[in-house]
Regions:
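C-terminal capping/lid region of NAD(P)-dependent oxidoreductase domains
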Residues: 2-9, 307-316, 327-347
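Glycine-rich beta-strand-centered segment in the early N-terminal region that forms part
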Residues: 34-51, 61-104
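NAD(P)H dinucleotide-binding glycine-rich loop of Rossmann-like/cofactor-binding domains
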Residues: 100-167
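NAD(P)H cofactor-binding loop motif with strongest signal on the N-terminal glycine-rich segment
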Residues: 167-168, 235
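N-terminal Rossmann NAD(P)H-binding glycine-rich loop of SDR-like oxidoreductase domains
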Residues: 169, 173, 177
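Adenosine-nucleotide cofactor-binding segment
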Residues: 181-240
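Helix-to-beta-strand junctions that scaffold the AdoMet/dcAdoMet cofactor pocket
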Residues: 247-248
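C-terminal substrate-binding/catalytic core of Rossmann-like NAD(P)-dependent dehydrogenases/reductases
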Residues: 267-318
Length: 347
């Protein structure tokens, strides 16, 4: 459908009404929905590009529920502000922005999306929409994990401290490596295939080790019996025991993947070590008083990108935003072997 064929009150979108395996053509469908109107703190954004993340496949995963109207997924976008709410102060129509959005509101796989200005920032000037869309969710996750949950300093005060990153080649790991390098941290990053090892090294990993082999022996060969902090962007359960073994006394572990079985926190007691979750949707989901922290975070990162200190983690653009391309993106994510980020751009 051409834009001129559309009623100005409607928009193109990709959604779901049933939760189905990704190979089912009905798992994600092209649809026409009412165009939303911004609330007081909202921006109405014309979406130009989106990225996909594991949260998309988790939300879409098969279950018995049925949606009366199509549910729109997608939590990574870049686009142009079309209209603003009555209390918006940070943006104006025409601004080019990037954001991840809120897990409890309609997502970015639509031609227009309403998003709270407090979790949005101007996109990097040096990136096009596709390059920018690859970054928001993973950047917020990595920044909050390293510099808020683990308490490391973003600007070098902790230079030389050791950080183990489990899952270095994925979307979050790819930006975490860059942030840690900039902070002067000594990173030990896990990867396994030649292409993922090279990717991690190119992003600035100090050391790369094989997650298919025992981690303690590989760390010891590099001169590390323990590490000051651990960021696990892969499987929390699978690495729990070894993380508890490798963390230094009074160190901290951060994870982002929900556990499948109870975690034995007692393994950390003698070391007075801490464990903390990172979920980048927390601020928007609960409307925390510091929601605007994500606006500031993305604003700062945009400056770092434009200064050449960080680079996009875009790996491949799969084509325009439609159901067929999004199903392919979900299919690739579910394989669990991706490098960097997948993006869709244009309608």
């Amino acid at each position: 459908m051409k834009p001129s064929d559309q009623d100005s009150r409607t928009m193109r979108a990709v959604g779901l009404t049933r939760y189905l395996p990704v190979d089912d053509p009905q798992s994600l469908i092209d649809c026409t929905l009412p165009r939303p109107g911004p609330g007081p703190h909202d921006l109405l954004v014309r979406v130009a590009a989106v990225s996909v993340n594991p949260v998309d496949t988790k939300v879409r995963a098969p279950k018995a529920a049925v949606e009366a109207t199509p549910r729109v997924l997608g939590w990574d976008a870049a686009g142009t502000v079309e209209a603003i709410g009555s209390e918006v102060t940070l943006f104006r129509p025409g601004d080019e922005v990037w954001y991840a959005g809120s897990i409890v509101r309609p997502g970015s796989n639509a031609e227009f999306q309403c998003v709270d200005e407090r979790i949005v920032a101007l996109k990097p000037r040096s990136l096009d929409f596709a390059q920018a869309a690859a970054l928001p969710l993973t950047t917020i996750t990595a920044w909050e994990a390293l510099f808020e949950r683990l308490g490391l300093d973003a600007d070098g005060a902790d230079a030389g401290r050791s950080l183990l990153i489990i899952g270095g080649a994925g979307g979050v790991g790819s930006i975490a490596i860059q942030l840690a390098r900039r902070a002067g941290l000594t990173t030990i990053v896990t990867a396994s295939r030649p292409e993922t090892i090279e990717w991690c090294r190119a992003l600035g990993a100090t050391h790369v080790i094989d997650h298919r082999q025992p981690l303690p022996a590989q760390l010891e060969a590099l001169g590390f019996r323990q590490v000051d902090a651990i960021a696990n962007f892969a499987d929390t359960d699978a690495y729990w025991a070894v993380m508890c073994e490798l963390i230094a006394p009074q160190g901290r572990i951060c994870a982002i993947v929900e556990n499948r079985a109870p975690l034995e926190l007692g393994l950390l007691k003698a070391k007075s070590a801490g464990f903390v979750w990172e979920f980048m949707f927390t601020r928007a989901q609960f409307g925390t008083p510091d929601m605007i922290a994500q606006h500031r975070l993305l604003t700062r990162v945009a400056g770092l990108v434009d200064a050449g200190e960080l680079r996009t983690t875009l790996r491949e653009t799969l084509g325009r935003i439609d159901a067929a391309n999004l199903r392919e993106a979900h299919r690739r994510l579910e394989r669990g072997t991706g490098i960097g980020k997948l993006v869709l751009a244009g309608w």
